[in-house]
From Swiss-Prot:
Gene (name only): ugpB
Alphabetized UniProt keyword annotations: Periplasm, Signal, Transport
Recorded family membership: Belongs to the bacterial solute-binding protein 1 family.
Name of the protein in question: sn-glycerol-3-phosphate-binding periplasmic protein UgpB
Function: Part of the ABC transporter complex UgpBAEC involved in sn-glycerol-3-phosphate (G3P) import. Binds G3P.
Gene Ontology cellular-component terms listed: periplasmic space
Source species: Brucella suis biovar 1 (strain 1330)
Taxonomic lineage of the native organism: Bacteria, Pseudomonadati, Pseudomonadota, Alphaproteobacteria, Hyphomicrobiales
Positions annotated to bind sn-glycerol 3-phosphate: 67, 91, 146, 273, 307, 346, 397
């Protein structure tokens, strides 16, 4: 995928580590990740395929817990001077990594160390921009980028008297369908959602073209004041809180736990990452895909990337950097990207892979599978929809989750929850400056 350079840049400023004294000794590269289920199987499959394609380097995938746990493990390992070669960091952790100058080596630089030239024009623009510095330098490699979508149980829709081939498009339509599903007994629960922070606040802002925070949600400056207690957010979360009172909406957890409520048949609708598709398919449920719901008069605008990217620490050996470059080049190959996209639901990060998938009529044969790509690429981003970048976004998400959980537990209404989240979140952001 990348262009091979005639000369390879020498490693500068890194601490050389001894890998082995024997000539042609294989260099092991630990890849710490947070993938489970079908996505963990894909990590193992790709690692095995790369290892069998050459003999100099060996990728060793290691599951380190969920996304936040993997990020924390990587930071702790770097501080103890024992970092992995590659660390998978979820979208919310990007600001943390970007702020750690000197601790990481940009992906573009790693590729040059391995003799490759990175050409950002070969990648989906929205993904490249999200993981790059303002000057365009690619900081991390976009392994599994995703967009949130609506999954729905076609059998439950049919039992409830809803059109199984017509998923709801707006949030009011989702809420009405959820009530009808529960009232009819088609499913015990009408609607659930994974990642209330990423989907229902960050992407909610982008998709409905409303501010998440000041300074273009942190992309124009680090001094950010949250704006997630404006009227549209309050209306949206109060509707969810009201549905939760009788179980029409069920809360599964802070990350992807709610996916189990859908794949088990308990809840008939789910907003979740496109990358959750592998487990949905594996469950055997009769599912359909719809675009992320929006509010009339506000959306749809564009979604922002989720999922995760691969980061490389400073202080590795020349051989490790060269091996990582070879692995990134392997992951960029069109056939690998097509496989990752078609099997997992994650986006094809290269334009070549996207075009190849279209040419094969995959999207015609699999309705809805192009939806997450079209959502992200459909419109030119506005200052509200370029993304969210906070140096402590994982911490801010924790604060929001605490307030959402109190709201869903009936301890406070949506306005109180969001007002508290803004007050506490702003204090945390200011303290992190």
């Amino acid at each position: 995928m990348f262009t091979r350079l005639i000369t390879t840049s020498a490693l500068t400023g890194a601490i050389a580590l001894t890998i082995g004294s024997q000539a042609f000794a294989q260099t092991e590269l630990a890849w710490w990740h947070g993938m489970t289920g079908a996505n963990n199987e894909m990590v193992n499959e790709l690692s095995k395929e790369f290892n069998e394609s050459q003999s100099e380097y060996k990728i060793v995938p290691v599951y380190k817990g969920n996304y936040p746990e993997t990020l924390n493990a990587g930071i702790a390992a770097f501080r103890s001077k024992q970092p992995p070669a590659i660390l998978q960091v979820f979208d919310a952790g990007s600001g943390v990594m970007m702020a750690a100058e000197g601790a990481i080596v940009p992906a573009a630089e790693v590729l040059e160390k391995g003799g490759y030239k990175f050409d950002k024009s070969q990648y989906l623009p929205g993904i490249v921009a999200y993981y790059s510095k303002p000057d365009g330098t690619m900081l991390s490699f976009p392994y599994n980028s995703s967009s949130p979508i609506l999954y729905y149980n076609k059998d439950a829709f049919k039992k409830a008297g809803l059109d199984e081939n017509k998923p709801p498009k707006t949030w009011p339509e989702v809420f009405e369908a959820a009530k009808k599903i529960k009232a009819s007994g088609a499913s015990p629960c009408g609607f659930t959602s994974t990642w209330l922070t990423w989907i229902q606040t960050e992407n909610f802002a982008a998709w409905n073209n409303v501010p998440y925070g000041t300074n273009e949600n942190g992309l124009a400056g680090t001094d950010v004041k949250l704006e997630i207690n404006s009227p549209l957010y309050v209306e949206h979360f109060q509707a969810i809180a009201d549905l939760a009172k009788d179980g029409t909406f069920r809360y599964g957890g802070r990350t992807s736990e709610a996916k189990q409520l859908f794949t088990s048949g308990e809840c008939a609708m789910l907003t979740e990452s496109s990358g959750g598709l592998g487990d949905v398919v594996k469950s055997g449920i009769n599912y359909g895909i719809g675009q992320l719901p929006y509010y009339e008069g506000h959306g749809p605008q564009n979604t922002i990337p989720g999922g995760a990217s691969l980061w490389v620490f400073a202080g590795l050996s020349d051989d490790q950097y060269k091996g990582i470059a070879e692995f990134f080049n392997f992951l960029s190959q069109t056939k690998i990207q097509v496989k990752l996209h078609e099997k997992s639901g994650y986006l094809p990060v290269t334009l070549a892979a996207y075009e190849e998938t279209k040419k094969s009529d995959f999207y015609e044969k699999n309705p809805g599978r192009e939806t997450p790509i079209l959502q992200m690429m459909g419109k030119e981003p506005t200052e509200n929809s370029k993304g969210v970048r906070l140096v402590n976004l994982p911490q801010v998400r924790d604060i929001l989750n605490e307030e959402f959980e109190a709201m869903l537990g009936g301890k406070q209404d949506a306005k109180t929850a969001l007002d508290n989240a803004v007050k506490r979140g702003n204090a945390a952001i200011a303290a992190a400056q």
